[in-house]
């Protein structure tokens, strides 16, 4: 039995100083538990890029709603500090000190998918090669259980964006998200 629950009318549109670019694994467009969609609906200066869709593969309603644009270097601006949010071997912990060191506005690029899919996106997406990777500091386990996770500190895309915003733009902005 599938419960029908839509949160769309509860989302308050918000424009951040930080630009959010979500690079979504194509299989995520088939999942109703995808929290990146909520983030995109709420955050006015966000973009979603679908990655890995095979040519000729039918588009899901979610993919059609968000767009079918592929991520490329053209999505990156030299006028902004482009950061990939994912805990990789090369990522540094996002902190107030790091944020203050940037002279340009920030674009936060967030891989979206299962943990396995999301880990592959920065490695396989040529446009993300050479960008600085950041990770969230240790925090409490997720407040949400949209899916079964293998580790209590794995969090959904929406929650990761919110926690990053607490550091980038302050706790008030994170609470609004």
For every predicted segment, state its role:
Residues 1-19:
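Cys/His-rich short segments
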Residues 19-26, 81-86:
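Short hydrophobic beta-strand segments
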Residues 26-28, 53-54, 89-90, 136-141:
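Short, acidic/turn-prone active-site loops that include or flank metal/cofactor-
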Residues 32-33, 58-61, 141-147:
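Short, charged, surface-exposed secondary-structure boundary motifs
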Residues 33-41:
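Histidine-anchored nucleotide/phosphate-binding helix
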Residues 41-119, 123:
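S-adenosyl-L-methionine/SAH cofactor-binding core of RNA-modifying enzymes
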Residues 107, 115-177:
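C-terminal folded domains that constitute the principal catalytic or ligand-binding module
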């Amino acid at each position: 039995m599938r419960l029908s629950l839509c949160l769309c009318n509860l989302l308050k549109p918000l424009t951040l100083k930080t630009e959010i670019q979500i690079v979504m694994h194509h299989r995520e467009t088939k999942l109703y538990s995808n929290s990146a969609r909520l983030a995109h609906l709420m955050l006015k200066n966000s973009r979603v890029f679908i990655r890995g869709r095979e040519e000729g593969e039918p588009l899901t309603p979610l993919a059609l709603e968000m767009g079918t644009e592929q991520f490329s270097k053209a999505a990156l601006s030299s006028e902004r500090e482009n950061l990939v949010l994912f805990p990789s071997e090369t990522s540094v912990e996002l902190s107030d000190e790091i944020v203050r060191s940037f002279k340009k506005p920030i674009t936060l690029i967030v891989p979206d998918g299962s943990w396995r899919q999301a880990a592959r996106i920065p490695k396989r997406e040529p446009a993300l090669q050479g960008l600085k990777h950041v990770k969230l500091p240790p925090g409490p386990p997720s407040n949400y259980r949209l899916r079964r996770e293998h580790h209590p500190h794995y969090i959904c895309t929406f929650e990761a964006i919110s926690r990053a915003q607490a550091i980038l733009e302050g706790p008030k902005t994170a609470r609004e998200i």
